[in-house]
């Protein structure tokens, strides 16, 4: 199978994230990057939307999930996003990065990157 990529960069959302008491009260900014690893040849050959991974649907599902979520860690949030992408939306494999701007003093952001397949959630 080809290792083609569909990339969504800089999805900016707000959610409850963090384990400090003040972080559990107000939503904070998170920035999400997603890379869907899939074979793009069928859609490239046919130019038919039915032959591509529907990244718009996946993006909407992730938005709904994140905005309704409340996690202590960005690691758990990233894993939840990956589950939505592969289990609910059918992505063969996904890389998810979650960034929390301003989380550490003197830095722009702190983040994690994970890679998952459906087998990781069975």
Q: Model-predicted segments: where are they?
A:
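N-terminal, polar/charged subdomain of small-to-medium soluble alpha/beta proteins
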Residues: 1-122
